């Protein structure tokens, strides 16, 4: 049975557009860490579809799911004005050569996908080759979404803080670190020039502990690429709130399906310095 929500009235942000949106986009993680049945997808779209802009089949999960399910899920998404994107899988197809990649693009088009994501870090190909793949996707009639990850040199991570993958910014910054960020942005700019529609940024290491770390890196990425052309993966609720508090409702975010409602509450409310999550008080389930 679908869930229905009655929302409190927030002060609307006049700049936030209706779907289809070019900014303030919310892309939802599909099957990956957990299985999303058609019934669950239907409930999400019926109850919160107006807040969901995109659905992504993460981690190449679309290669393991029956094509009949994929087609039905994509059709369901399209009925609610939701675009559908592939996840990290195109780079695996490239191991079989350029012809296999062309076949992959055509298969994605036949299944109904709107966007193909290219993980630039996993591809490990020359920049010109990456740009050629972007053009192949565009020539196939689909949207191209290159993904870049902000990485750090291990030598830049203090040994005492390496436990559990935590990261503390070293002082002073190394020149290699700065060059890597500039290189990432330059590659992303060239992808946009080649026709890419959106640049996905995996910046967990930068902003997972953002209150004490490198918010300036995110600002540099947005400043160079533009807020409309960038999308950030927000892996948890605190990170979602961090982005909205600093960049407002128009920042594009990729989140888990469980964060959709909380994210929309945050987008629809003006936030102060002492803002706390409004999820517990922003809606009623009945």
UniProtKB/Swiss-Prot annotation:
Induction summary: Accumulates after heat shock (HS). Enhanced translation during recovery after heat treatment mediated by CLPB1 in a positive feedback loop.
Pfam families referenced in this protein's UniProt entry, alphabetically: ComA (PF02679)
Annotated keywords: Stress response
The keyword Magnesium is assigned to this record: no
Transmembrane segments: none
Phenotype of the disrupted gene, per the record: Normal growth and development under nonstress conditions. Compromised acquired thermotolerance following a long recovery period (> 24 h) after acclimation heat shock (HS) treatment, but normal when challenged within a short recovery period. Reduced expression of several highly heat-inducible genes. Slight increased in sensitivity to HS without acclimation. Faster degradation of HSP101.
GO biological process, one term: heat acclimation
Keyword Kinase carried by entry: no
Domain of life per record: Eukaryota
Family: Belongs to the phosphosulfolactate synthase family.
Functional summary from the UniProt entry: Transactivator required, together with HSP101, for long-term acquired thermotolerance (LAT) maintenance, probably by regulating heat-inducible genes expression, thus being a cellular component of thermomemory.
Name by which UniProt lists this protein: Protein HEAT-STRESS-ASSOCIATED 32
């Amino acid at each position: 049975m679908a869930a229905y929500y009655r929302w409190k009235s927030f002060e609307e942000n006049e700049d936030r557009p209706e779907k289809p949106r070019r900014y303030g986009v919310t892309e939802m993680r599909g099957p990956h860490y957990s299985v999303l049945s058609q019934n669950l997808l239907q409930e999400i779209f019926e109850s919160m579809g107006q807040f969901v802009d995109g659905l992504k089949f993460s981690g190449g999960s679309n290669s393991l799911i029956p094509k009949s399910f994929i087609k039905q899920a994509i059709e369901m998404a399209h009925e609610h004005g939701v675009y559908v994107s592939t996840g990290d899988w195109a780079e695996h197809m490239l191991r079989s050569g350029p012809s296999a990649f062309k076949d992959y693009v055509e298969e994605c088009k036949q299944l109904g996908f709107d966007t193909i994501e290219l993980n630039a870090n996993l591809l490990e190909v020359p920049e010109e080759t990456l740009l050629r793949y972007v053009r192949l996707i565009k020539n196939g009639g689909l949207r191209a979404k290159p993904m870049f990850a902000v990485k750090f040199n291990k030598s830049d991570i203090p040994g005492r803080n390496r436990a559990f993958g935590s990261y503390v910014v070293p002082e002073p910054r190394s020149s290699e670190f700065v060059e890597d960020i500039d290189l990432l942005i330059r590659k992303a700019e060239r992808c946009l020039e080649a026709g890419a529609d959106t640049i996905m940024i995996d910046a967990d290491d930068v902003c997972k502990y953002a209150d004490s770390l490198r918010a300036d890196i995110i600002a540099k990425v947005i400043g160079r690429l533009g807020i409309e052309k960038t999308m950030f993966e927000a892996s948890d609720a605190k990170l979602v709130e961090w982005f909205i508090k600093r960049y407002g409702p128009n920042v594009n975010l990729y989140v888990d399906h469980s964060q959709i409602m909380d994210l929309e509450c945050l987008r629809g409310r003006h936030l102060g310095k002492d803002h706390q999550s409004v999820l517990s008080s922003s809606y009623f389930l009945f």
